[in-house]
Amino acid sequence: MAADGGMFESSRSIEEKRESKRRARQELLSKAKDDYSKAEKRKEQQRLRGEDTWMLDDVNDRLEALNQEHSAKNKKKKEKHRHKLKKEKKKKSKKQKSERNDDSEDSSSDSEEEWVEAPPLQAASEKKAWKIKAEVKAEVPEKSTERDEWMTLDFMSLKATSAAAMRAEKQKEKTLEHEKAQAAETEKLLSRELNPYWKDGGTGLPPKEGDVTSVKKLQHVEDGGLSWLRKSYQRMKEQSERENRSLDDIVAERYGSMEDFQRKLEAAEQAASQNSNDGQRERWKKSHSQDDEFRRYPRSSQHTDDNSRPRHTDHNRYNKYSHKESQEYKHSEESSRYRKEPEHRRQSFEDRNQDKSVSFKPKNPFLKPSDDDGRSLNIRDYKSLKNKVTGVQDSSKPCFQKPLSNEDEISWKKVPSKDCSEKKQQQSQDSEKPFFHKPSGSEGELSWKKIQPKYCSEKKQESQKEDSVSKERKGSREQTEPDAYSRESQSVKERPQSPRPDRSPQPIRILSDEEMNKLGAKIVKAELLGNMDLASKLRAQLEEARQQKERKSQGTSPVSERRSEAEESNLNKDNEVLLVRTDQSGRAWPVNAAADSMEPKGGRRKRQMVATHVDKERVRYFHDDDNQSLQDMVKREKMGTSEDQNKQFLRMASKFMEKTDRDYYTLDDMFVTKAAKKEHTDKEEERERMQAMHEHRSLTATMEKCRFCFDNAELPKHLIVAIGTKVYLCLPNHLSLTEGHCLIVPLQHHTASTLLDEDIYNEIQVFRKALVRMFESKGLDCVFLESNIYARKRLHLVYECIPLPKEVGDMAPIYFKKAIMESDEEWSMNKKLIDLSTKDIRRAVPKGLPYFSVDFGLQGGYAHVIEDEHKFPSYFGKEIIGGMLDLEPRIWRKAVRERFEDQRKKVLEFAQWWKPFDVTKE
């Protein structure tokens, strides 16, 4: 067994492994639960201690004052706006008054030039003025004595109505209006309803089997709404012709869009095909046993031993009606149905039956075949038999016959019932009429077959010839698939005027590169074999596929042009994002939008070489030198970084190392050749967009996790001591290096002092001077540290103030100078030590470079440009101070957490120190 190389394991060992996995999984789950419970317990304890709510009273007052100032500013803005509106209204009214006065002055300009004495008032009336006033006064009380109608109204006779009754009345009116609207809507729907079981108060379902009308009504049910949709499409088409409007607009009004209507039509066709498939399985099993010579089952090539077994019992079991009963039932049902139909319905039904090929024909489910249908073998035999039994019927009424069984072809046709002579004369028109075919078995096998009667053998041979002729005319359209869905789709394809709506062209499938390569291989193979016709066809197909791919890359596909435009407009409305990139100095500029490139995307293509020399003289180095102006080159140089140059260098060196081993081909030649190769026009823009998206995501994640941003919920409020307009003063959230260790932090997210605005930098200097005066009053010296190491991480700017004893503070410049000179790389590209005694950090260090700076009180200090960010420690300044004060390395190497009570004591003590020097209260 070992020689076979098989490794066997006992069930016990397998069970032990499973058990160990279960235990490990259980331990992990229990550990995760414990950690979660501990974290929740810690949060609850912090909440009970008041860590999330407690803060200094001065800080609380300051926050309230800031809120009041903000609200006062908003009120002032609102009042100012309101006052402005009032002024504008007054100005408008004054203008209108002045215009009116001007008009009146213009009209009475002549009268103003002369003074005319007014006639005396007594001339108008002989009565004195005082008498007129008295009369007016006397008339006023007479008018007041007349009472209004409501005063004389008897309120006790009025009908009292409560609020509940009024509400009930309103609700009743609303329900009545709703019922009226619903009734009107149902009337409209019933007028358009094509389902006969919904009309005249129907339930939508067919009646029981005992009802006579159930047989005919089955023609309009179980089709999934297909007939209704086709009729609706016909009406929409007629409406478009009548109103001279576009068909797409009318379809969009009713169904939303043509695509939605087509989707519903396809779903209805699938449902109808499934229903017809299920129904035909039961119907075609039924046969009729009036004459044994007409009832025999097929003989299969694989089951020849079963042919001798009688099948009379099977036939008798499915036989339900005799020939005469079936014909009488059909005539009585049709006559009663015809009498019940209204006049316009009867006329429309006759018109539809007279011209089925022109009008829309809903998919009728095939009813149970009668005895004469089962006895028929072809169209001619059916007519002769029917004339013997039932006499001559109306020739305009179509009939559906059960299909014939034939080794070569099985077909049954729907034709008008006419004489055999007329059938021969109209044989040339049979190919234009719809054919319904029953699928045959594979390789000529038939699942059922009927033996034709002796007196119809000659007619059957003639019909077979006619069927073969019609089959040749149909050509490749005839298919024999075994499912009902293919049968229905074939019948729809063969109709001369399909009721299917005029669909928009289906979206063409774009060939992939692999498929196009296979197509090219077929072209080569056809050319080698000498089949030039096939090669030309395949070549045209390949060219068309390439054009479609180019159209898709350009976004101008004619198939989905309208849909793509709508989707793009929706996307532009919903997701409009401005991508920006930030350079070393903190300036941001927008990234160019994506341009529609004419070059196809995907696949590996050889990059074309650009001519770099003309007459043995170099005219360009890079492929885009002709498109770059001096302004563009300066812009790219200022906005680019050293990382961009390194990435470009790596891209040029990555995929061109295969030729370096050849003679006379050096590394310089490789870069020169690589630079001269033409790149895709949109590659650089795509690269910039991806870089901008990456920067935006990283900045968003950094700002969400930042514990120093004033708007962040995780900011430790209990450590804040003072709040200014642009910066705030707080204590560290860990064990302090010395007593009085504090931080000056901007309110907003800023990364370095070299990128600060003027007002923020000035306020930091104000806090710095106040802290120096505070520590001087305590007999201490102080050192200010700032580390801007990881510029790409965009960390929050923190300006640390660490108090020192006087004797240690005097020696601090010597310690820091020596440490800076020995730090970082031995050979540096920038100056090792930068003196800040004569200029501040903003003028000493270029923007965007990582640096470390130290200031000693109000004096200047030193700065150092960091060469290697990975080798320079983030605790560099604290390490020097810890060495000067002989502190434990754990204090400055890794932040040591403190209890809330210790932090609160520390904050209260520092607040007492800070209170006399608080610059925020001035």
UniProtKB/Swiss-Prot annotation:
The gene is cwf19l2. Gene3D superfamilies: HIT-like. Residues 12-106, 165-278, 525-557, 673-706 form a coiled coil. Residues 12-52, 167-191, 288-355, 369-384, 410-435, 456-503, 540-553, 560-574 have a biased composition (Basic and acidic residues). This is CWF19-like protein 2. InterPro entries: Cwf19-like, Cwf19-like_C_dom-1, Cwf19-like_C_dom-2, HIT-like_sf. The keyword Coiled coil applies. Belongs to the CWF19 family. It comes from the Eukaryota. Residues 73-95 have a biased composition (Basic residues). The keyword Coiled coil applies. Residues 102-116 have a biased composition (Acidic residues). Residues 1-130, 164-220, 261-513, 540-574 are annotated as: Disordered. Pfam families: CwfJ_C_1, CwfJ_C_2. SUPFAM superfamilies: HIT-like.
